[in-house]
Amino acid sequence: MKNQILLLRIAGYISLLFVVFHLFFYPMFNWENALNGLSSMNRAIFLTYHAICILMLLFMGIIPIFQTKSLLGSSLKYGILSLFLLFYLIRIVAEFTLFGISSSSPAILIMCLVPMIFYSIPLFSKQTIK
């Protein structure tokens, strides 16, 4: 049980690191100019989805860090942790299918694989918290 709490909190902190990283995307990728090639509608959709992604990552960090025992003790853990797991699984698949293999791929793979595994362990554990 203590291991599950530790794993979820580590995964939560990694998710919060992704929040910080994503907050720098706008200047890092020069989106002010780079997104000018998109129609105003596609630009708005892109930026909206990015904001939602940041919010989702924030949720994926805060809940496991501050509500770990509540999460593990609830039947909602199956839905919530499955969603977290799928989020990172989709990101891993996207790394190779949409972005292509690059020099940063191993780092992204590891940074996504660790929380994906850590979020999945409580799903398959028989331990329960009351």
Identify the residue ranges that each predicted region occupies.
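Membrane-water interface at the C-terminal end of transmembrane alpha helices
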Residues: 114-130
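Cytosolic juxtamembrane helix and N-cap/initiation of the first transmembrane helix
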Residues: 1-18
